[in-house]
Each structure stands twice: as structure tokens, then as C-alpha cells.
Design a protein with these regions (language model features):
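Thr-Gly-centered strand-to-loop micro-motif
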Residues: 13-14, 101-102, 123-126
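Short loop segments at secondary-structure junctions
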Residues: 7, 30-35, 103-106, 142-143
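Conserved core of the PLP fold type I
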Residues: 1-5
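Residue-level detector of flexible, active-site-proximal loop/helix-junction positions
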Residues: 16, 98, 130
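Short acidic/glycine-enriched loop/turn segments that link adjacent beta-strands
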Residues: 23, 95, 130-133
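PLP-dependent aminotransferase class I/II
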Residues: 8-85, 89-92
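PLP-dependent enzyme catalytic core of the Aspartate aminotransferase-like
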Residues: 107, 114-124, 128-164
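Conserved PLP-binding catalytic core of the aspartate aminotransferase-like
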Residues: 74, 78, 83-119, 135, ...
Length: 164
């Protein structure tokens, strides 16, 4: 609605998260015609690969898969948030395919990240975003979510006992 009512607003979206096409660097923009015209004139001639375009088109046609991924993410994001909150961790509210888990300090976040990596789980330490005490954890499949909860439960138990 805002894009339709203003001549200087652009809305962009990516196919990275819900469609799982992050590596293809495909997205779209909704904007007034004069802005789209300008973007067409300044963009590179082949700014989206043929494979990326084909994948994006296929993803748009398969809305049932998108709905399945959305529902899975909502369910397991809520589950993981509840599990980690019960461990005393602070989880920022999220509507994305990841949660931001805040630890007591940067050192505890680094040690939690190391514990998860030992279990084969890779998170993103977000110190470079000004959040040294936080980890960004993507909502994966059920097994991955349960593993994150398991390894962080073990880590926090050890931490509280002075062993982590």
C-alpha cells in the first residue's frame, strides 16, 4: 500500500529465505514505474543468471512448498524459542527463519558456538553486527532443532555447574 501511495518508496524481497535460493542471489522489487525504469537503465545486462531465473520461476509456481516451509518454520521457531528460553537464554522476537539467542556476554556466546560446532551445528556469531553476546541460529529441520536444544542444554548445564 505504501509503495502504491508514494512515488519514492521501493519494496524489495529476496528468494533467499522461504524459497531457499540464497546462493542464486535472486530477488524482486515493487516500485513506481519511473523508479523501475531507472533501475532497468542502470542494471547490468545479465544481472540474474538463467539458472537463478528458472529456479525463482519454479519456486513461485510451487506455492504449496512455500506454505509447507513457512508452517515448518513457524512451528519449529516457536518450539526452539520455548526450549532455549526455558534454559534461561534471551531470544529476541522473530518472524524470520532464524532466532537471535543472547547469552550473558561475548565469551559465553563464543563458548556456546564452540559447543554447537562440536556437535556439527554451525551458527552465526553476530559480533560484527554489534551483538558480541548473540548467536543467530537458523531454523532447520526437526533433527537440527532438537540437536541445537540438546547441545545448548548440555552447555548451559555445564556453564551453571562451572564446567562450560
Amino acid at each position: 500500500a505504501l509503495v502504491s501511495s508514494r512515488d519514492n518508496v521501493v519494496m524489495t524481497r529476496t528468494f533467499s529465505k522461504i524459497y531457499g535460493l540464497g546462493g542464486l542471489r535472486v530477488g524482486w522489487a515493487y516500485a513506481p514505474a519511473h523508479i523501475i525504469d531507472t533501475l532497468h537503465r542502470i542494471r547490468g545486462p545479465f544481472n540474474v543468471s538463467g539458472a537463478g531465473l528458472a529456479a525463482a520461476e519454479a519456486a513461485m509456481r510451487d506455492q504449496s512448498e512455500m506454505a509447507r516451509v513457512r508452517d515448518h518454520t513457524i512451528t519449529w521457531r516457536a518450539w526452539l524459542t520455548a526450549e532455549l528460553t526455558a534454559l534461561g537464554l534471551q531470544i529476541d522476537p522473530s518472524h524470520a527463519n532464524f532466532i537471535l539467542v543472547r547469552f550473558a556476554d561475548a565469551e559465553q556466546a563464543q563458548r556456546a558456538d564452540a559447543a554447537l560446532r562440536k556437535g556439527g551445528l554451525i551458527t552465526r556469531h553476530v559480533a560484527s553486527y554489534g551483538l558480541p553476546e548473540a548467536l543467530r541460529i537458523t531454523i532447520g529441520d526437526e533433527e537440527a532443532c532438537r540437536s541445537v536444544a540438546k547441545y545448548l542444554r548440555e552447555f548451559m548445564t555445564g556453564f551453571l555447574e562451572g564446567n562450560a
